[in-house]
């Protein structure tokens, strides 16, 4: 069966991708998963310099999923280019680099460094709820989202996917904003902001107090938002949020997604 998908001019062997932050750069999972079977590997967020992330504890189990506040810990663009890209190039899968930053200039620096690298697509993360600056600050304001999309597009040599947050009043307006800024595709949803209390310690389960909720509990919300975004814009949509089964993925495709990303399910035994 031919399951190839054209995503912004890039051919994927199938529409199944990993979700950023749940698969590293693929090496950790390569002993358990044949990366050649994936449509694309979406890397963990990559910044201009190494980020330490948030203090621990930063992961907690919740009903129907998990709560995390990793804070986009990553080794930085230098090590990513030196180590991770050569590893991924050994496989017959597309490479999607998730880019994170605190400021527009930091995003641009990473995008510019990747311009001459053999990667296929860029996913710009303006939707992480677990960093104090950047990310979600762009992802909740349509004007800011449009402006950073336009700024990144000036430097990008690969197609640009803008990753949207569900923590907004209107996902349709956010989708329209990044499309107006020149986005080649849109991915959604990132995690929903949540909180858990450790009743035995009488304190927050996470050091960051709040974190991002992911897993099957958010799937119906994700399906609804993918549907709304797909009906608001004319660029391809990548659907994610609580996808565990083929049926979950098909739901996303039926409401307008061109491809899907699997995230929290990667953490299951």
Where are each of the predicted segments found?
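Short gly/pro/ser/thr-enriched loop/turn and capping motifs at secondary-structure boundaries
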Residues: 47-52, 129-131, 193-196, 267-269
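Acidic-and-aromatic substrate-binding clefts and catalytic sites of carbohydrate-active enzymes
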Residues: 24-25, 105, 268
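Alpha/beta enzyme core
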Residues: 31, 102-238, 247-257, 262
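Small/polar glycine-rich anion-binding or flexible loop at a beta-alpha turn
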Residues: 243-247, 269
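Short beta->alpha connector loops at strand-helix junctions that form conserved
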Residues: 44, 241, 263-264
């Amino acid at each position: 069966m031919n399951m190839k998908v054209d995503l912004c001019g890039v051919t994927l062997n199938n529409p199944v991708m990993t979700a950023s932050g749940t698969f590293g750069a693929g090496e950790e999972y390569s002993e358990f998963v044949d990366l050649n079977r994936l449509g694309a590997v979406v890397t963990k967020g990559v910044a201009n310099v190494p980020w330490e992330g948030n203090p621990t504890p930063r992961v907690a189990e919740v009903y129907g999923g998990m709560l995390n506040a990793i804070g986009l810990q990553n080794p930085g663009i230098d090590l990513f280019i030196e180590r991770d890209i050569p590893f991924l190039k050994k496989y017959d899968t597309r490479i999607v680099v998730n880019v994170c930053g605190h400021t527009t200039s930091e995003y641009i620096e990473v995008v510019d460094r990747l311009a001459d690298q053999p990667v296929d697509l860029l996913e710009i993360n303006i939707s992480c709820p677990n960093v104090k600056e950047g990310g979600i600050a762009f992802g909740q304001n349509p004007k800011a989202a449009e402006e950073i999309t336009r700024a990144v597009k000036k430097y990008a040599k690969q197609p640009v996917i803008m990753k949207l947050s569900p923590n907004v009043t209107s996902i349709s307006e956010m989708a329209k904003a990044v499309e107006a800024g020149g986005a080649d595709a849109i991915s959604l949803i990132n995690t929903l902001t949540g909180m858990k209390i450790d009743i035995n310690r009488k304190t927050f389960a996470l050091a960051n107090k709040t974190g991002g909720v992911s897993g099957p509990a958010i799937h119906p919300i994700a399906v609804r938002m993918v549907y709304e975004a797909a009906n608001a814009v004319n660029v391809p949509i990548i659907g994610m949020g609580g996808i565990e089964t083929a049926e979950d993925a098909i739901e996303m495709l039926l409401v307008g997604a061109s491809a899907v990303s699997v995230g929290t399910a990667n953490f299951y035994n």
